[in-house]
């Protein structure tokens, strides 16, 4: 039934050069789900990382079992939006979590998300950096401005009703995510935003949880100059088509 909470959660984890982060993310995820008694699987969608991410994923598959860790790689870097679509094909959970492998998201929040979902029987639970105690640590001013600017622009143009659209950490009811993916046209980071905009149009319910977003434990921030340009382009396209 629609009122059912998360019985099994599928985590879609797109990776590109995340060799150092992956074992820690997987360990934290596994521990969090086990502590909260939620059945889970982690689907690793690696886009042909040259750094040995896939070899690490194979080791993790051996350690945790292939029912818990599913490596479903692609030949080359094809972008976030299509990574989630690819991962969905293999997901068996009734709820889906989409997140980055770079530990920007407090993994322990999965438990909170599941609780929040049950509390309001939401279709989607999204983390927000700009509500209550969801502060942003370790972000330089430029990133803060870009992130706030992106959010502000999106809110002005599209009024989507979720205060942090770019925070790519969400829990979706599986059939809701499938429906949204059919409707989404964007690639890359814009994809995350479009999902929420479309969700609102289709009348799905969104619960929000404040996230204290600790900027990437290892590795450089992934939002490069050309990402930002394509983000803005995507935003305009989205504005034109909604």
Language model: regions and residue ranges:
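Conserved donor nucleotide-binding strand/loop of the catalytic core
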Residues: 40-43, 54-90
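N-proximal low-complexity "stem/linker" segments adjacent to membrane-targeting elements
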Residues: 1-31, 37-38
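Catalytic donor-sugar/metal-binding loop of nucleotide-sugar-dependent glycosyltransferases
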Residues: 160-161, 186-187, 196-214
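Acidic helix N-cap motif at the loop->helix transition within catalytic regions
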Residues: 20-24, 51-60
């Amino acid at each position: 039934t629609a009122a059912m909470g998360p019985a099994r959660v599928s985590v879609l984890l797109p990776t590109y050069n995340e060799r150092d982060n992956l074992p820690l993310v997987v360990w934290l995820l596994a521990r969090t789900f086990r502590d909260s008694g939620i059945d889970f699987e982690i689907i690793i969608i690696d886009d042909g990382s040259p750094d040995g991410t896939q070899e690490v994923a194979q080791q993790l598959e051996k350690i945790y079992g292939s029912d818990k860790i599913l490596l479903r790689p692609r030949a080359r870097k094809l972008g976030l939006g299509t990574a989630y679509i690819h991962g969905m094909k293999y997901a068996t959970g009734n709820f889906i979590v989409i997140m980055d492998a770079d530990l920007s998201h407090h993994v322990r929040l999965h438990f909170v998300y599941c609780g929040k979902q049950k509390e309001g029987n939401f279709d989607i639970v999204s983390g927000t950096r700009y509500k209550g105690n969801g502060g942003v640590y370790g972000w330089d001013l430029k990133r803060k401005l870009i992130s706030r600017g992106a959010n502000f622009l999106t809110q002005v143009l599209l009024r989507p009703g979720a205060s942090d659209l770019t925070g790519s950490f969400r829990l979706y009811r599986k059939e809701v995510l499938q429906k949204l993916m059919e409707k989404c046209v964007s690639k890359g980071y814009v994809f995350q935003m479009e999902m929420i905009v479309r969700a609102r149009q289709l009348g799905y319910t969104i619960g929000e949880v404040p996230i204290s977003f600790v900027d990437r434990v290892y590795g450089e921030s992934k939002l490069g100059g050309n990402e930002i340009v394509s983000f803005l382009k995507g935003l305009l396209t989205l504005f034109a088509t909604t």
